């Protein structure tokens, strides 16, 4: 391969550099598109969950629907423990501690970090209604998943408050 003009060599070099830049930008764009699609999918799931809560009544239905929804959202095994009255006690001591302290505990948290379960209270500013237990055998909730779970928890608290108001009538 022999070039007669140095301008051809410079042109080829410029084309190679431009091709590398375009390729890098395309890879970044593809990653951003994948991320946007994933966020859209999760937002859609959260909206679906919220719509499903509109048709739920009774603590047993709330518990069952919450477990199914969180399991679909995270892809992990989830148990929801609700207290209909303050005198009840959970049989699980860590769940009881989480409920009483209104703090997360278990896997990856400051309190009881060696446990395989992650215990997250279902609460609003004034009151705790129950505990969500994630089975964290061989995995952890990522920060972005915690945000989605917190969104669902706020929906659960609204449904529980609605249920309690309807019982008081």
Predicted regions and their residues:
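GAF sensory domains
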Residues: 48-159
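Signal-transmission/dimerization alpha-helices at domain junctions
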Residues: 15-28, 125, 148-169
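Membrane-embedded alpha-helical core segments of multi-pass
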Residues: 14-22, 41-44, 74-75, 127
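Short intrinsically disordered, low-complexity coil segments enriched in acidic
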Residues: 1-9, 95, 105, 169
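Membrane-proximal extracytoplasmic alpha-helices
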Residues: 8, 12, 41-45, 69
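Transmembrane alpha-helices and immediately adjacent membrane-cytoplasm interface residues
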Residues: 1-33
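Short acidic-hydrophobic sequence patches enriched in Asp/Glu that either
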Residues: 5-8, 41, 90, 148
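Membrane-proximal helical linkers
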Residues: 24-65, 168-169
């Amino acid at each position: 391969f022999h070039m007669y003009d140095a301008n051809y060599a410079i042109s080829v070099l410029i084309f190679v550099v431009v091709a590398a830049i375009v390729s890098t930008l395309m890879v970044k764009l593809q990653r951003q598109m994948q991320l946007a699609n994933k966020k859209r999918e999760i937002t859609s799931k959260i909206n679906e969950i919220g719509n499903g809560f509109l048709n739920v009544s009774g603590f047993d239905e709330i518990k069952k629907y919450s477990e199914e929804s969180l399991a679909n959202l995270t892809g992990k095994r989830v148990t929801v423990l609700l207290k209909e009255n303050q005198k009840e006690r959970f049989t699980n001591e860590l769940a009881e501690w989480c409920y009483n302290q209104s703090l997360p505990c278990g896997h990856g948290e400051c309190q009881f970090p060696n446990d395989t379960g992650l215990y997250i209270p279902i609460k609003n500013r004034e009151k705790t209604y129950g505990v969500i237990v994630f089975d964290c055998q061989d995995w952890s909730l990522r920060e972005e998943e915690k945000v989605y779970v917190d969104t669902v928890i706020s929906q659960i608290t609204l449904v529980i408050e609605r249920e309690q108001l309807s019982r008081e009538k």
